[in-house]
């Protein structure tokens, strides 16, 4: 690879390709003349669509194949949804850029009802996320939560076919793919705390590729990175992945970060929450602090039970 060419490893889903094309456009805008090509591939998480993520188990379901491409020099960077990125990286790889965050909220999507509060008792709601399930059932224990996997188009098609009264998706994905008009309402973070990193795009590359790091620098968004650093530190301290009922969300208040964290039973029976404020420069330490507060309330018992159920399948 020359310094004027970058190969982007990406999943083949419409949203992943949008994110890769976004990074490509930003790179070429920042570096006129730079040649950028996409290397699409299929991840394990894309292949196993007949099971909930929590039952498949393991971390890095959507990134390992892309990381292999980096390690084998088949690509120079990999573009990820930050909520899918594991806390630890293979030796020789690292996260060197986080782009500006899109709307981090969850979106309520229905062809009949305008909001979660309007759903009649016993309505069927589709989601593949234990995090969303735990918060939904705490607020509305009468709802029937039904398994929903697949790409954004597939999920919308299942809703349109009448399989669900409503579905919950990340607002960012709908906005990026031009489906903003399908959002019946955005769910406040007070009612559905997002997943760590939700709405943010991250770029992974080889740690030794200094030229690549320099090319990525104009795409890095420091405010988003500070927020996501706090969220990921919480997740890491709880040993969380993208398929467990952990939520966390950080906002900047000047040079302070306000971080909220949550761990919930998938049944909605118990929802633990904690929050703290601290200096932006200590984002990672703040994540550990909030995670410790959750552990002190018994979060590890909830997470052990979830991992145990995944292991029994």
UniProtKB/Swiss-Prot annotation:
Keyword Transferase: yes
S-(dipyrrolylmethanemethyl)cysteine modifications at: 242
Physiological role: Tetrapolymerization of the monopyrrole PBG into the hydroxymethylbilane pre-uroporphyrinogen in several discrete steps.
PROSITE patterns documented for this protein: PORPHOBILINOGEN_DEAM
Entry keyword annotation includes Phosphoprotein: no
UniProt pathway annotation: Porphyrin-containing compound metabolism; protoporphyrin-IX biosynthesis; coproporphyrinogen-III from 5-aminolevulinate: step 2/4
Assigned EC number: 2.5.1.61
Subunit relationships: Monomer.
UniProt gene name: hemC
Name of protein: Porphobilinogen deaminase
Biological process according to GO: protoporphyrinogen IX biosynthetic process
GO CC terms in record: cytoplasm
Keywords: Porphyrin biosynthesis, Transferase
Class of this enzyme: transferase
Pfam short name (any one): Porphobil_deamC
PANTHER family, per database record: PORPHOBILINOGEN DEAMINASE
NCBIfam families given in the database record: hemC
Domain of life: Bacteria
Cofactor: binding details: Binds 1 dipyrromethane group covalently.
Extra remark beyond the main annotation: The porphobilinogen subunits are added to the dipyrromethane group.
Entry's Gene Ontology molecular function annotations: hydroxymethylbilane synthase activity
Cofactor(s) the protein needs: dipyrromethane
UniProt xrefs under HAMAP family: Porphobil_deam
Species per Swiss-Prot/TrEMBL record: Pseudomonas fluorescens (strain ATCC BAA-477 / NRRL B-23932 / Pf-5)
Reactions catalysed, as given in the entry: 4 porphobilinogen + H2O = hydroxymethylbilane + 4 NH4(+)
């Amino acid at each position: 690879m020359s310094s004027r060419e970058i190969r982007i490893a990406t999943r083949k889903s419409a949203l992943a390709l949008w994110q890769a094309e976004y990074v490509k456009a930003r790179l070429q805008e920042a570096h006129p003349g730079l040649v950028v090509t996409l290397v699409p591939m299929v991840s394990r998480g894309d292949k196993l669509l007949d099971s909930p993520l929590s039952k498949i188990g393991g971390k890095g379901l959507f990134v390992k194949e892309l990381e292999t491409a980096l390690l084998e020099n088949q690509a120079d960077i990999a573009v990820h949804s930050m909520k899918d990125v594991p806390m630890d990286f293979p030796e020789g790889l690292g996260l060197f850029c986080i782009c500006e965050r899109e709307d981090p909220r969850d979106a309520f999507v229905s062809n009949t009802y305008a909001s979660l509060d309007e759903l009649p008792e016993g309505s069927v709601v589709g989601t593949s996320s234990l995090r969303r399930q735990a918060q939904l059932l705490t607020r509305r224990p009468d709802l029937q939560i039904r398994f929903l996997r697949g790409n954004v188009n597939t999920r919308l098609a299942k809703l349109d076919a009448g399989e669900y009264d409503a579905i919950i998706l990340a607002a960012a994905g709908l906005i990026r793919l031009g489906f903003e008009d399908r959002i019946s309402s955005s769910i406040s973070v007070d009612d559905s705390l997002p997943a760590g990193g939700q709405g943010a795009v991250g770029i992974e590359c080889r740690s030794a590729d200094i030229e690549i790091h320099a090319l990525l620098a104009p795409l890095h968004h420091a405010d988003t990175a500070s927020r996501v650093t706090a969220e990921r530190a919480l997740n890491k301290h709880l040993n969380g992945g993208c398929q467990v009922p952990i939520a966390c969300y950080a906002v900047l208040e000047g040079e302070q970060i306000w971080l909220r964290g949550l761990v919930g039973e998938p049944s909605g029976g118990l929802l633990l929450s904690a929050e703290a404020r601290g200096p932006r420069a200590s984002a990672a330490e703040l994540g550990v602090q909030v995670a410790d507060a959750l552990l002190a309330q018994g979060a590890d018992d909830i997470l052990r039970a979830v991992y145990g159920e995944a292991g029994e399948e």
